[in-house]
Structures are given as structure tokens and as C-alpha cells.
Amino acid sequence: MAMTDSNPTRCGYVAIVGRPNVGKSTLLNHILGQKLAITSRKPQTTRHNMLGIKTEGDVQAIYVDTPGMHKANDKALNRYMNRNASAALKDVDVVIFVVDRTKWTDEDQLVLERVQYVTGPLIIAVNKTDRMEEKAELIPHLQWLQEQLPNAEVMPISAQQGHNLDALEAQIAKHLPENDHFFPEDQITDRSSRFLAAELVREKIMRQLGAELPYQITVEIEEFKQQGHVLHIHALILVERDGQKKIIIGDKGERIKRIGSEARKDMEVLFDSKVMLNLWVKVKGGWSDDERALRSLGYGDL
């Protein structure tokens, strides 16, 4: 086992689980110190498990950002996301259960019922505690959570503001097993650049559309090519109905131009290159409930 100044080298997997839209991806981004996982105010923004890798000195923590566990199981895409989230609880060294201090929902209860069978270290990260004016009001909620999961450690945090994340990371590191590092020190994810580009486009669509949002959208990268100092990316946006296509394109193409402009700016930061981004929208009816179509679009084992 590698040693540095008598400190053991530690490395392990950390699952971040919770209901949709509770702050899991925001937490991962803040821990990594850069944007990796896409975020929006809409539930089910995250669809795939994704690794975010942080190496600091002797410790390498490999975070698994998961889709929010939810009750809807009517479509193949929903079943895929729920299976991904549940699978993340297996074969990891630490589980972080993210909850919102402002409310407790049926979907929080669903996650609680799954994590109660976790045999390894479990940390309940109570998010958005920075918004409480009177901290004493938080104590009964923390006590209630501790009663529900007596073997868990309960920690108040703010994923957005970074409050108490140093303490959270220190607690995680303490639980990681003594291992050589699994990934190079400078690697931050297991996902390809194509995947990250597609996710950035999907994020901008979700943020732009608001209440009009068609959830039956996905993004496929058809071309990803570096030519000189310019990265050329062609992205295909798939929807299920003609009406959804019109919504994404917008009046005289203004909305898709905004989506492209915002996605391109983030891509240039992420890939450290000038980006030429072209977007197309195509109708593919019923893709979100077609297991064969989902597999062809990169949604893994169904």
C-alpha cells in the first residue's frame, strides 16, 4: 500500500442519492470546484449515473451522481433512471443521502426505505440550511432524521453556498478504504467529452423552456471534431412530437439560437477551446418508452 508521510492512501466510491431536484448535482459540482453535472430547477434533470473524481493529496473520492429516485415508473426512461439510482447503492464505500431541510416528500420516503438497508457508512446531508434565519428550528428536523436512520451521520450543508462541505468531505475521507488510487490525479470524470457536450445542450433546453418543457427530449452528438483551434460539434435534439419541435425552435428560431449560444459558452470553458456548435431538432415518436431506442441513444442496460 502506497504511503505518504505516514498517511495511508485512500480511494473509494461515494454514491450521492436522493429524490429529484434536491441538490445532488449542485453538491457534486461544488465539491469538484467546477461544473461537471448539469443542473436546473426541473426534476429529473440528471438521467445517468456519472462519476466525479476528486483527488486531494492521499485521498481520491469517486463520487457517483445519480438520477433522483421517483415514483413514476410508467415509461422505460423512468424505469432506467430508477434502476440506475438504486444500483448506485451497491458496491460503494459511502452513501450520501441528500434531503431538503424545507420539506419531506413521498419520494424522500422512498429513498429512505432504500438506504435503510445500506450496511456501510451513511451520511444524511441536509441541504439548504443556509436559508434558515433561526438555526434552532433545524434541530427537531435533524433529530427526526437521526431517529429514522440511527446508524447514519446527519450533517447540515448548503450545496449552493458550500457551507460545511469541508466537514462533509473530511467525514467521507475518513470512511474510504486504504487503496491505491484508481484514476490519474488529473482525471475528473469517467464520461466522454461527447457525453458532456450533449448534457450541456440538454441543460440549456431545460433552463430555457420552463413550464413549456417537454420532458421527452434527449440530445445526441453526431460530430465532435477538433480542426485547428476550433472544436466542431453537431448536436441532434430528439423530441417526440411536432409541437415539441416548434417549442424548442421558437419564434423565427430565436429560442434554439439562445440554447446554442449558452451551451457553446459553457463548452468553451469546459473544453478550453473555441467551439462551433450546430443544433438540429428531429421528431422521433415514442423514443422515451422504447427500450431499443433508449439503448441506441446511450441509456445503457435496460
Swiss-Prot record:
Residues 127-130 are annotated as: G4. GTP binds at residues 18-25, 65-69, 127-130. It is a peripheral membrane protein. One of its GO terms (molecular function) is GTP binding. Residues 201-285 form the KH type-2 domain. Belongs to the TRAFAC class TrmE-Era-EngA-EngB-Septin-like GTPase superfamily. Era GTPase family. Monomer. This is GTPase Era. It comes from Pseudomonas putida (strain ATCC 47054 / DSM 6125 / CFBP 8728 / NCIMB 11950 / KT2440). The gene is era.
